[in-house]
């Protein structure tokens, strides 16, 4: 008996919608990364994209525990000398709340072309509306 190796074009990704209201950032991100990789499926193959599509709504209502709301800092560099920018979790939540979930999940995916393809299957929106109703996403309890 040979070991089954799934091909990316053979596995179809299902669509799921996740409500991030009052969910803890890390615990939600772990589950999203696992489903984007496809590790919850029996036909999971490390070298193929076997994951699902995930739509996250209400990203502006995400929660963190402890003092992380004040203490957690997000850094990025503009590319110019001396231009390391930083923003706290609270400021990021005010300006770009969807980026909080995106950065957390992106850090949990592989750092290669396959990981970037998996990341494209994640759609994050601040409100409760999303433009993917044609794909009929199923609600996912995390």
UniProtKB/Swiss-Prot annotation:
Keywords: Ribonucleoprotein, Ribosomal protein. One of its GO terms (molecular function) is mRNA binding. GO terms for cellular component: cytosolic large ribosomal subunit. This is Large ribosomal subunit protein uL13. The gene is rplM. Belongs to the universal ribosomal protein uL13 family. PANTHER family: LARGE RIBOSOMAL SUBUNIT PROTEIN UL13M, RIBOSOMAL PROTEIN L13. NCBIfam families: rplM_bact. Part of the 50S ribosomal subunit. This protein is one of the early assembly proteins of the 50S ribosomal subunit, although it is not seen to bind rRNA by itself. It is important during the early stages of 50S assembly. InterPro entries: Ribosomal_uL13, Ribosomal_uL13_bac-type, Ribosomal_uL13_CS, Ribosomal_uL13_sf. GO terms for biological process: negative regulation of translation; translation. The keyword Ribonucleoprotein applies.
């Amino acid at each position: 008996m040979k070991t089954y190796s799934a091909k990316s074009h053979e596995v179809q990704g299902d669509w799921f919608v996740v409500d991030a209201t009052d969910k803890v950032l890390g615990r939600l991100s772990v589950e999203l990364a696992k489903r984007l990789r496809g590790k919850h499926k029996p036909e999971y193959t490390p070298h193929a994209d076997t994951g699902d599509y995930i739509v996250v709504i209400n990203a502006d209502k995400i929660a963190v525990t402890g003092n992380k709301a004040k203490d957690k800092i997000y850094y990025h560099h503009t590319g110019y000398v001396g231009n390391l920018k930083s923003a706290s979790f609270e400021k990021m939540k005010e300006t770009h709340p969807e980026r909080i979930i995106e950065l957390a999940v992106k850090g949990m995916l592989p750092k290669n072309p396959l990981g970037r393809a998996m990341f494209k299957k994640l759609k994050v929106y601040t409100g409760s509306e999303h433009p993917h109703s044609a794909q009929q996403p199923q609600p996912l309890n995390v």
